[in-house]
Swiss-Prot record:
GO terms for biological process: one-carbon metabolic process; tetrahydrobiopterin biosynthetic process; tetrahydrofolate biosynthetic process. The keyword Iron does not apply. The lineage of its organism: Bacteria, Pseudomonadati, Pseudomonadota, Gammaproteobacteria, Pseudomonadales. This is GTP cyclohydrolase 1 2. Homomer. PROSITE patterns: GTP_CYCLOHYDROL_1_1 (PS00859), GTP_CYCLOHYDROL_1_2 (PS00860). Its EC number is 3.5.4.16. Keywords: GTP-binding, Hydrolase, Nucleotide-binding, One-carbon metabolism. Belongs to the GTP cyclohydrolase I family.
C-alpha cells in the first residue's frame, strides 16, 4: 500500500467522503508533504556537509544561533517548531557556516523527540569537526501539547547537550549560555 493510499484510508476512517471536491487530491498532497517533512532519512552527514571542513587556527567558540527548525513528534506525528543554538570550539578545523544549519535540518526532518534531536546534532558536529567541545540548545513549541492533551499554548520545551569543553568547563558553558539569551 502506498503512502497516498494510506492517507485515503485514514480520511475514510475519519468519516470523510474522499470523493468530495476538496479532498480529491489531498491524499497525494499529504503523501508528498510527509515525504518532504521526513526527507532527513534520505540524507547523510557526508552529503549535507559536502566537504566544507576547513583548516583553521581558530580556537575560540564558533556559534550559530537562532537556527529555525521544524520537526515531527514521533509519538503523534504533529509538528514541533523552534530554534537551535549550536556552538563548537574548533580543534584545527572549522565547518562551513551553512553546514551547521543543514545538519540541524537533516536531523529535524525525521520523526523525532526533541531530546534525541539535540543529541544527534551535537554528536554530528563533534564527529565532523573533531571539536574540543560542542553545545546545542533547542527551544521549541510542540503542537502535540498545544492542540491536544493538556492544550497549553504558551509552554516551550528547552533541551541542551554539552560535550567536551562545554560539559567540563563551567566558564565555557556559561559563556555559551549567556550568548544565546
Amino acid at each position: 500500500m502506498t503512502l497516498e493510499q494510506n492517507y485515503t484510508a485514514i480520511l475514510g476512517q475519519l468519516g470523510e467522503d474522499v470523493s468530495r471536491e476538496g479532498l480529491l487530491d489531498t491524499p497525494k498532497r499529504a503523501a508528498k508533504a510527509m515525504q518532504y517533512l521526513c526527507r532527513g532519512y534520505a540524507q547523510t552527514l557526508e552529503e549535507v556537509t559536502n566537504g566544507a571542513l576547513f583548516s583553521s587556527d581558530a580556537s575560540e567558540m564558533v556559534m550559530v544561533k537562532d537556527i529555525e527548525l521544524y520537526s515531527l513528534c514521533e509519538h503523534h506525528l504533529l509538528p514541533f517548531i523552534g530554534k537551535a543554538h549550536v556552538a563548537y570550539i574548533p580543534n584545527g578545523k572549522v565547518l562551513g557556516l551553512s553546514k551547521v544549519a543543514r545538519i540541524v535540518d537533516m536531523y529535524a526532518r525525521r520523526l523525532q523527540i526533541q531530546e534525541n534531536l539535540s543529541r544527534q546534532i551535537a554528536e554530528a558536529i563533534q564527529q565532523v569537526t573533531g571539536a574540543q567541545g560542542v553545545a546545542v540548545v533547542i527551544e521549541a513549541k510542540h503542537m502535540c501539547m498545544m492542540m491536544r492533551g493538556v492544550e497549553k499554548q504558551n509552554s516551550a520545551m528547552i533541551t541542551s547537550v554539552m560535550l567536551g569543553e562545554f560539559r567540563e568547563n563551567a566558564a565555557t558553558r556559561s559563556e555559551f549560555l549567556s550568548l544565546i539569551k
